[in-house]
Amino acid sequence: MLPRVIALLTGLGLCALAQAKPTQYPLTVENCGSTLTFAQAPARSVTIGQAATEMLYALGVGDKVVGTSLWFNNVLPPFKALNDNIERLANNEPSFESVIAKRPQLVAAELEWVVGPQGVVGTREQFHELKIATYLLPSDCEGKDNRVGADGTRLEPFRVDTIYKSIRQLAEIFDVQDRGQQLNDELKARLAKSVATVHSKGLKQASALVWFSSAEMASDPYVAGHKGVPEFMLQTLGLRNVVQSDEEWPAVGWETIAKANPTVLVIARMDRRRYPADDHEQKLAFLRSDPVTRNMDAVKHNRIIILDAMALQASVRTFEGLEQLATAIDGYDLPK
């Protein structure tokens, strides 16, 4: 594995030297079942979902964003000044009216349940009838059925290539292909670095659980299923997910989790406060006091890793989350 990682890093350095071609308009893009045509780069965009927002910021087109919404964490520090000057339409889901009031030429959405067939903000057709293009991040529609389960059900395992595809397509839409290529190269290098960090651990027996949130502290937690982004992160670093549901974030009882006795617990940190368990401090207090959870090995040995919620979603933060997860795992004495 390690020689391949080194080869990948070397290859990325060479790839960065090649320049991408400028966009030829009109541009046609196939996106999550819709065919989009752009006569020119969008001058005004609204984002619904932090992953879409920070992806546009990372591509250097934040000056084209006129409204944001659906936040889990504070914006990445390098983008704070930029983000402070852009209107936040809502902390959670915005209204359809508030989005179209910004007169966007493009709505970039992270999740199909906000803009899709049963979109809580609106359907793609509603926006398209107003000549507003909609772009959905492929990570939430490819290999996934969002009609099944509270947060959708994966028909096939999440592929990290869908993140690279989002970046590549958005870069083409906004005519910033060089930056898109550079960003993808940077993210691939971070992925390779994370794998190299835990390479010597040779993990085969270690397991993990990823706890996102809970509607109530005492209710069944929303945890990562075995085909989503967290599963990709765990598998990449040699950990086995104790949850085998195809749902994105199924609710699983603590008794079932305790019986599986994961080696490591990963908990999401959020700045939003929709549910009590959005607060990671409350998560920690619960784990250490509840009679069922406090006897799990991960709790007794303090093998609890805190990651930003957005690192557990398909986003540019996924790779930072992988680095943090790899560093934490490298510091543990885990079964091999």
What function would you assign to each model-found segment?
Residues 29-33, 87-97, 140, 246-254:
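Short helix-initiation/N-cap motifs at beta->coil->alpha
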Residues 44-117, 239, 273:
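A short, structured surface patch at a secondary-structure boundary
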Residues 114-122, 132-169, 201-229:
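Extracytoplasmic ligand-binding site segments that recognize negatively charged/polar headgroups
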Residues 157-166, 267-336:
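Structured C-terminal subdomain patch of bacterial secreted/periplasmic proteins
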Residues 96-103, 121, 252-261:
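Short helices/loops that flank or line small-molecule/ion binding pockets
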Residues 42-43, 85-86, 110-114, 149-157, ...:
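Second-shell loop/turn segments in exported
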Residues 73-74, 85, 220-249:
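Alpha-helical, coiled-coil/dimerization segments enriched in small aliphatic residues
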Residues 5, 9, 18-54, 156, ...:
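Bacterial Sec-exported substrate-binding components of ABC uptake systems
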